[in-house]
Amino acid sequence: MENIPMTVFGAKVLEAELLKLKNVSRPRIIENIVTARAHGDLKENAEYHAAKEEQGFIEGRIKEVESKLSRMQVIDVTKLNQDGRCVFGTTITLMNIEDDSETTYKIVGEDEADIILGKISCHSPIASALMGNEEGDEVTVKAPKGDIVYEVLSVEYI
């Protein structure tokens, strides 16, 4: 199994999710199952079957999160050699050469990616094109609608 790169923030979010699943969701669903069982015949007890189905989802998610946590490689960008290069965890401001529009992205792990928040996966075409480049470099991103050329305006280790 391969390691899963993750920022410090991403690791904390995943750890918090696991705690909530184990300490809130799991006990709640067990209580729901006990309550539904008390209603009698389990064959036609929709409440019971729904609770058991939810229990399956919760237990599956717990296993998935535990697996990710066991394989995660936490990368603290503030402790990296800050040589100005685009690497995992850096926040990069780009200017589209064609229309002079600016965009800022943070390169994060797969599970943390959220384009609306400006967080892109380290495996995305944009991140792949940016890796290793530095302020002032022009980078060509192969996008579905065609090549897009950006200038790297800044690289921050925050």
Curated annotation (Swiss-Prot):
Gene Ontology molecular function: DNA binding; RNA polymerase binding
SUPFAM superfamilies the UniProt entry points to: FKBP-like, GreA transcript cleavage protein, N-terminal domain
Superkingdom of origin organism: Bacteria
Pfam family for this entry, one: GreA_GreB_N
Keywords assigned by UniProt, alphabetized: DNA-binding, Transcription, Transcription regulation
GO terms, biological process: DNA-templated transcription elongation; regulation of DNA-templated transcription elongation
Keyword Zinc (UniProt): no
Keyword DNA-binding among record annotations: yes
InterPro entries, alphabetized: GreA/GreB_C_sf, TF_GreA/GreB_CS, Tscrpt_elong_fac_GreA, Tscrpt_elong_fac_GreA/B, Tscrpt_elong_fac_GreA/B_C, Tscrpt_elong_fac_GreA/B_fam, Tscrpt_elong_fac_GreA/B_N, Tscrpt_elong_fac_GreA/B_N_sf
Function noted in UniProt: Necessary for efficient RNA polymerase transcription elongation past template-encoded arresting sites. The arresting sites in DNA have the property of trapping a certain fraction of elongating RNA polymerases that pass through, resulting in locked ternary complexes. Cleavage of the nascent transcript by cleavage factors such as GreA or GreB allows the resumption of elongation from the new 3'terminus. GreA releases sequences of 2 to 3 nucleotides.
UniProt family annotation: Belongs to the GreA/GreB family.
Protein name: Transcription elongation factor GreA
Organism classification: Bacteria, Pseudomonadati, Pseudomonadota, Gammaproteobacteria, Candidatus Pseudothioglobaceae
